[in-house]
Amino acid sequence: MAGSLSEIKAKIISTEKTSKITSAMRMVSSAKLVKSEQAARDFQIYASKIRQITTDLLKSELTIGSDNPMLVSRPVKKTGYIVITSDKGLVGGYNSKILKSVMDMITEYHADGDYEIISIGSVGSDFFKARGMNVAFELRGLADQPSFEQVRQIISQSVDMFVNEIFDELYVCYNHHVNSLTSQVRVQQMLPISDLVADEAAEEGVTGFELEPNRQDILDQLLPQFTESLIYGAIIDAKTAEHAAGMTAMQTATDNAKNVINDLTIQYNRARQAAITQEITEIVAGANALE
């Protein structure tokens, strides 16, 4: 019985230590979430402005006849997917949701292997490589609040692959942050731009522009910036969802640990009571034997 009591007590102590660790990790994820949400709000100011300018430009007559490849829709022979996952685990179903969605799309639409994956996050990279899938580029070790400089190269590589007709459409696949408890899988088209904002442009009237130095130079500078802002915004959004998922997962782990501690404490008290009862019974039996 003494052995049983000591084993239960050891489990209680071990679970309490685990609970303290998961509680601390929840607090860290919570702090990261607050920073990411603020970063997303700050970036949205820039993103909305550049989107408005691009949409106004596309609904004007100034883009008619432009040969900028980012505006050109062409027959789709191959599709590019930027897939954003985390670099670590302990984020609940964050990674499994997006990976399942990507696998479903590839199974349904790309049985012939007519796709390229640009992977952001170690979990996704390892997942795709283990299955022998087409990973063109990858980025590991993304910061908790990634700067544009950190992701500039892989974004530029993705855009260049479209411009050079390695693939004919570009999508970004990620978890969109809704709130601290909820995220939604998003598969959002990035290129060609003409498809992306055509509906928005059609809803409003024509805007007049006078551009300096000339139309083509403006388009050549604006369109890459616009696309890069969309992809970077998706990365910030995905990171925010990741921190929220980590916070929720650690809160769940902490709650589960507390439930285990309560159950073990009840077991310990019952075992201790049984041990005391047995000792009393043995003492009484011994006293009766002496009479």
Swiss-Prot record:
F-type ATPases have 2 components, CF(1) - the catalytic core - and CF(0) - the membrane proton channel. CF(1) has five subunits: alpha(3), beta(3), gamma(1), delta(1), epsilon(1). CF(0) has three main subunits: a, b and c. It is found in: Cell membrane. PANTHER family: ATP SYNTHASE GAMMA CHAIN, ATP SYNTHASE SUBUNIT GAMMA, MITOCHONDRIAL. This is ATP synthase gamma chain. GO terms for biological process: proton motive force-driven plasma membrane ATP synthesis. Keywords: ATP synthesis, Cell membrane, CF(1), Hydrogen ion transport, Ion transport, Membrane, Transport. The keyword Iron does not apply. Its main location: membrane.
